[in-house]
């Protein structure tokens, strides 16, 4: 796969602005994305995407963890054949960046999941569809066309419905199954609680379930048609996902019925990583759900080194939670992640400018990653290692949030 110069996006912005008086559609400044999104979203929608568990201390820890790791640039290194491509599960990708699963994208813009999946295909960036989506599996696959797509599973309790979801995902070209382990029940989220708002109870974000033939048949057998009672159907679907944790032993059921890589998402402790390795799954994501589940927890980046040491190269370790910039991606790679999932920034872009806004955010992240690696003397992802960083705290690092 020939390398892609993602830094050319920076050149394009300067050229368009200088010669054509054409400025970027949305800001390139990651510190302003949330502010601009808040200006266009309803209070309920903004609270849902920007909120976290409790007093948001885990969200803050995610950002503070990044600030406490500093890159140590190297100079005078050849960069003629710079590449940020990676190989994950035998598949070559042009970069280590993956758009992670975020639910109810229709809450933020009418372009929703299908729009983001489309631009991911255009950029050749993997798109991860959430079970909690406002678009169906089939519609997202059609929008993503020949793109790389992964399916994130919220583990439904009814095995017949679960098998139907897996079948639909596989038949529609989703190649990697990402299983969320940390959301079997909701974290305590005051920003949503104060507004008494949970979009799924309003029928928003249930499209994967509502479009499932097995769920529909079971619901109708109980005497109700989904379209005649959206609220009742919403309650039935949510009950399939909530309040009953699964066990490590049950992972075998997924392995039996999914032909492809399985990634366990939500690992924060090295012992859980070792247990994940024992299941035979191919990968894991070091993630605390962006600080939305457990308040008072460690920053996800702080969990990464121990987990990488625990499983070594026996599993593909990936990372999310708190990623805002290209430098953040580099730091996660240096600490051992093979790929990095990003969520909130893409959704802020979607809110501000629809699918083109989401595309701009992804392009900015890729360009920032490319430029940052090159300037730090990292020709390829293989050059990203712990020797490239130092852990140092400065007083200004107490400013944690982007």
From Swiss-Prot:
Q: Which cofactor does it need?
A: FMN
> Which residues bind a 2-oxocarboxylate per the record?
48, 154, 189, 292
What molecular functions are annotated in GO for this chain?
A: FMN binding; oxidoreductase activity
Q: Which UniProt keywords apply?
A: Flavoprotein, FMN, Oxidoreductase
Q: Please report the name of this protein according to its UniProt entry.
A: FMN-dependent alpha-hydroxy acid dehydrogenase qulF
A Pfam family found in this protein is FMN_dh
Q: Which family does it belong to?
A: Belongs to the FMN-dependent alpha-hydroxy acid dehydrogenase family.
Cysteine pairs bridged by disulfides in the record: none
Record note on disruption phenotype:
Impairs the production of quinolactacin A2 and leads to the accumulatin of N-methylkynurenine.
Q: Which PANTHER family match?
A: DEPENDENT DEHYDROGENASE, PUTATIVE (AFU_ORTHOLOGUE AFUA_6G02720)-RELATED, S -2-HYDROXY-ACID OXIDASE-RELATED
Q: What is its EC number?
A: 1.13.12.-
What general EC class does the enzyme of this chain belong to? oxidoreductase
Sequence positions that bind FMN: 130, 152, 265, 320-324, 343-344
* The keyword Acyltransferase belongs to this UniProt entry's keyword annotation: no
Report the function annotation for this chain: FMN-dependent alpha-hydroxy acid dehydrogenase; part of the gene cluster that mediates the biosynthesis of quinolactacin A2 (QUL A2), a fungal alkaloid that features a quinolone-gamma-lactam hybrid, which is a potential pharmacophore for the treatment of cancer and Alzheimer's disease. The quinolone-gamma-lactam hybrid scaffold is synthesized from the combination of L-isoleucine (L-Ile) and the nonproteinogenic amino acid L-kynurenine, followed by quinolone cyclization, oxidative decarboxylation, and lactam formation.
Q: Where is the active site?
A: 289 (proton acceptor)
């Amino acid at each position: 796969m020939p390398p892609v110069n993602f830094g050319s996006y920076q050149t394009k912005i300067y050229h368009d602005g200088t010669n054509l008086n054409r400025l970027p559609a949305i800001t390139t400044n990651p510190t302003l994305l949330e502010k601009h999104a808040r200006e266009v979203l309803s209070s309920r929608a903004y609270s849902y995407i920007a909120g976290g568990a409790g007093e948001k201390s885990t969200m803050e820890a995610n950002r503070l963890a990044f600030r406490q790791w500093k890159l140590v640039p190297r100079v005078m290194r050849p960069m003629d054949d710079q590449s940020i491509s990676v190989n994950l599960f035998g598949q070559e990708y042009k970069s280590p960046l993956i758009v992670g699963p975020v639910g109810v994208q229709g809450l933020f813009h009418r372009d929703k999941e299908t729009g983001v999946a489309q631009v991911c295909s255009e950029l050749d960036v993997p798109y991860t569809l959430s079970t909690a989506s406002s678009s169906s599996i089939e519609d997202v696959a059609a929008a993503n066309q020949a793109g790389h797509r992964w399916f994130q599973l919220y583990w439904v309790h009814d095995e017949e419905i679960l098998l139907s979801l897996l079948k639909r995902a596989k038949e529609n070209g989703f190649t990697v199954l990402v299983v969320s382990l940390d959301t079997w029940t909701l974290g305590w989220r005051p920003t949503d609680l104060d507004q008494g708002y949970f979009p799924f109870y309003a029928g928003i974000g249930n499209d994967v379930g509502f479009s499932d033939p097995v769920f529909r048949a079971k619901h109708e057998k109980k005497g109700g048609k989904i379209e005649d009672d959206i609220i009742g159907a919403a309650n039935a679907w949510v009950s399939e996902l909530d309040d009953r944790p699964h066990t490590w032993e049950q992972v075998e059921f997924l392995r039996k019925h999914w032909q492809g890589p399985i990634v366990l998402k939500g690992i924060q402790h090295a012992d859980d990583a070792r247990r994940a390795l024992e299941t035979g799954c191919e990968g894991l994501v070091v993630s605390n759900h962006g600080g939305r589940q457990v308040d008072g927890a460690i920053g996800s980046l702080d969990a990464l080194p121990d987990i990488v040491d625990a499983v070594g190269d026996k599993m593909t370790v990936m990372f999310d939670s708190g990623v805002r910039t290209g430098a953040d991606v580099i730091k996660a790679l240096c600490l051992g992640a093979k790929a990095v999932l990003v969520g909130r920034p893409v959704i802020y872009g979607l809110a501000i400018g629809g699918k083109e806004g989401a595309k701009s955010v992804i392009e900015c992240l890729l360009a920032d990653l490319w430029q940052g690696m090159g300037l730090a003397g990292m020709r390829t992802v293989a050059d990203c290692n712990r020797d490239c960083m130092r852990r140092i705290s400065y007083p200004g690092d107490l400013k944690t949030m982007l």
